[in-house]
Amino acid sequence: MAAPAILNGGDATERETRMAHSAMTLVQVINGGYHVVTKVALNVGVNQLVFCVFRDLLALSILAPLAFFRERTIRPPMNRSIFFSLFFLGLAGIFGNQLLFLMGLSYTNPTYAAAIQPSIPVFTFLLAVLMGTEKVNLLKVEGQTKVGGTLVCVSGAIAMALFRGPALFGGKDAADSVKSVIIDRSQPELNGWLVSSFLGLGFDQWHIGVLCLIGNCMCMAAFLAVQAPVLKKYPAYLSVAAYSYFFGASIMITTAILFVREPKDWSLTQSEVLAVIFAGVFASALNYGLLTWSNKILGAALVSLYNPLQPATSAFLSTIFLGSPIYLGSVLGGILIICGLYMVTWASYREQQTTSAGNEIASSSDVRISEPFIYRDETGK
């Protein structure tokens, strides 16, 4: 089903809506390129924590001045609730999201890392139900479709985790020949302890990477689920992104100081510096700024809907630049994830359109059709 692209009234114009859709397309294209760039950096042997620290500091140095000068007149006062919400956004959306992604990517490949990202919208829906911000009526078709789509999507994620299958395209994964080098030489004690713990339980490195990527998706889902109501109370989107990066970078720096033992790990080669610049400027500052603004305009339902663009972009780029193969398990699991995703979003939009039609009759035609499905107050506005 095609997602509604126009908001009838509300606080966003049709031009802003079109710009937000274009922005989210750009975000996912950049994310696909980021998967390839970071895989190359990991293969060279850059320390994951050090990479994240430099990336976050660079992004914060861009977002903080922009937020300070552009939103000084519209930034609401800070309170305890907003403070802790922003801290959580930094913990989940910056620290957990980035670190788990890099750990997962180092043990899999860019195609696989991108193929599992479409599970983010369904994880967002599950968290919204647990938080009580999304209701499911199992007596209606929409509610049944939501539950069915969630199960289909989770089944796809499980299939990707348990079934790798033969390579459909490409040859031997370039990452296989360097994994041991990456693990032995480059990664901090935090990573080594985590990996050794899972290896002791019978997991291999591929499945450890898959678990890290699932954790990465859940962190991003939590980030979107919490960010939507925060933007209602604190509509300065650049400030929300900057504060999130401030808290996330602070946690990342503290973790790096504790677990990065080798001074040489803090020195970067020229190619690693270029990877950090791409990650900090484009995949962090630009992407998170656009994502936060689009979340304010479109809502998390539509923002999450753009994640399925990542697998195609990443697969295309990684096959060209890395020679990474595309596995049967990734294809089958990705198909299930995307099918489940569209089942959930179709049911959500059906419910929203029904609610909007009722509100138009009861009040006026100035009603938001594309209301975020992870946030709903008592009045339904």
Curated annotation (Swiss-Prot):
GO CC terms: membrane
EamA domain boundaries: 31-143, 225-345
Record's keyword annotation contains Cytoplasm: no
Entry membrane topology: Multi-pass membrane protein
GO molecular function: transmembrane transporter activity
Signal peptide region: none
Segments traversing the membrane: 26-46, 49-69, 82-102, 112-132, 151-171, 206-226, 240-260, 273-293, 297-317, 320-340
Cellular localisation: Membrane
S-S pairs: none
Pfam families membership: EamA
Keywords for this protein: Membrane, Repeat, Transmembrane, Transmembrane helix
Family the entry assigns: Belongs to the drug/metabolite transporter (DMT) superfamily. Plant drug/metabolite exporter (P-DME) (TC 2.A.7.4) family.
Protein name as annotated: WAT1-related protein At5g45370
Organism: Arabidopsis thaliana
